[in-house]
Amino acid sequence: MPILRSATSTQGRNMAGARALWRATGMKENDFGKPIIAVVNSFTQFVPGHVHLRDMGKLVAEQIEAAGGVAKEFNTIAVDDGIAMGHGGMLYSLPSRDLIADSVEYMVNAHCADAMVCISNCDKITPGMLMAAMRLNIPAVFVSGGPMEAGKTKLSNQLIKLDLVDAMMKSADKTVCDDDVDAIEKSACPTCGSCSGMFTANSMNCLTEALGLSLPGNGSMLATHADRKELFLTAGRQIVELCKRYYEQDDASVLPRSIATKAAFENAMSLDIAMGGSTNTVLHLLAAAQEAEVDFTMADIDRLSRKVPCLSKVAPNTNKYHMEDVHRAGGIMAILGELERADLLHSDTRTVLGMTIGEQIAKYDITLTKDEAVHKFFRAGPAGIRTTKAFSQDCRWDTVDDDRQNGCIRSKEFAYSQDGGLAMLTGNIALDGCIVKTAGVDESILKFTGDAIVFESQEEAVEGILGGKVRAGHVVIIRYEGPKGGPGMQEMLYPTTYLKSIGLGKECALLTDGRFSGGTSGLSIGHCSPEAASGGTIGLVRDGDKIAIDIPNRSIQLLVSDEELAVRRAEQDTKGWKPANRQREVSMALKMFGHFATSADKGAVRDKTKL
């Protein structure tokens, strides 16, 4: 029978000092011997996805205490990728993921916590906490802050839906007047919550449902809706139940590594492909799998991407639907239900509710259940009122969207495309692979051959795009922006957004060893591995080289002879694999990250051979 980890600091005469300190935090005599449960919050006033989380820890803690546990809350850092975008701050985004994972490990192990509830939301916070949960392997439940309501404004007397990307794109479009840019800016992000499209934050919060570590509705229920409160309350109660099952009944099936098995990781990746999620999820799932010691690799992703169709298109892949529409269509349980019916899901994986994922689908899929409470839950909708308050409204759609032929979520028969929403490409320029969000690529450029125009930083690429150097037919190369080369693997949302703003969104391709925001669409290929700083072929590309991209056949080739590439490689070995003229201040913290980082195909995790 497992012993409470917290007994290390709460039991025995020699722990009198530790108990004295615990008492100073408010613990009473009868609390010693109860499970101490870490409430891992990420409240910050810097990030709209986290600005409403201050009181969420208290909600969870009250339920833990009522159910017989002891709750102790701490906070992690949280970086807003949108605010950090387009300047040196973006170098810190991906490294913050690993820092969050480490800080959770430090706090939980230093204080011998028995379990944890992870209150996350935005881009690197959910992955960081997920990595920590896999690493620690103690009972854990995830509950996120929820998505933002989509923005809405009138342009040319027409009501349109908006999100962050619209504000960025229109600001760079010289044909859009200042008044319209101002109107879009003030309407794009109306409430608290993670940005309203299927960007990285929402993608990851959806994937925790597929992994079995969060509750149904976690990825799609709006941050502002009163119904979301129940997710926090249930998380607090359920974590105590998981503690009892593990520590009192010796049931290891409730532990994260028992729930998030390889089959569960395949379910999560299949969901990501089906919903056209962010390419960043590939990076984070690979990293979490390594922490879980699960053999889940790019080869598995490639295999799944060849058979899973695209069942949902949400912003930025379309302007028609946002997360509030996904929820109305039944949320993640509905997409998983369609995958199950297409025999593309492992239905026997477990969840923190003690059910299999198949049992949860049977209970929560709106096309299967007649339960009015479930239908009411998925009719929760936006209020259209600017607010930073959670649970501040109780608006509902009149009906759910259960149209699987023409609705937001489709069946396999009526899929947006039989080819999935993400694809891995390989070739001589990306021997270990690269990733493209096919759900955001126009059909006319699924095959594309063009001339390379090379930039050795994101900043240089932005100047080139806005300065007129990039023309139709170019393949824009942005290199030395990988985990090592950046260091930090910046997101390239500004270059892709600016290409669209000047009318080249369907006329150019972009290839980088960096990564893309979940808000990116177009022929944008990231995670090129090995990266330039590790001697990858992307570091050998020269202006004017032909590059052939063939998404249907999963191929990307630099059309330069092996002999010429060998000559170039010898020259580059002499020069060193670093950008020629880039001026960039890099802190010691970032240098440390870059020194230990692997390429994107390994999840940009630490290279353990260097430890």
From Swiss-Prot:
UniProt keyword Amino-acid biosynthesis, yes or no: yes
Short name of one Pfam family: ILVD_EDD_N
Gene3D superfamilies assigned to the protein according to its UniProt record, in alphabetical order: IlvD/EDD C-terminal domain-like (3.50.30.80)
Modified residues (N6-carboxylysine): K124
Chain sites annotated for binding Mg(2+): D81, D123, K124, E491
UniProt EC number: 4.2.1.9
Any single GO CC term annotated in Swiss-Prot or TrEMBL for this entry: cytosol
NCBIfam families found in the cross-reference section: ilvD, PRK12448.1
Family per record: Belongs to the IlvD/Edd family.
Function: Functions in the biosynthesis of branched-chain amino acids. Catalyzes the dehydration of (2R,3R)-2,3-dihydroxy-3-methylpentanoate (2,3-dihydroxy-3-methylvalerate) into 2-oxo-3-methylpentanoate (2-oxo-3-methylvalerate) and of (2R)-2,3-dihydroxy-3-methylbutanoate (2,3-dihydroxyisovalerate) into 2-oxo-3-methylbutanoate (2-oxoisovalerate), the penultimate precursor to L-isoleucine and L-valine, respectively.
Protein name (database record): Dihydroxy-acid dehydratase
Lineage, uppermost ranks: Bacteria, Pseudomonadati, Pseudomonadota, Gammaproteobacteria, Pasteurellales
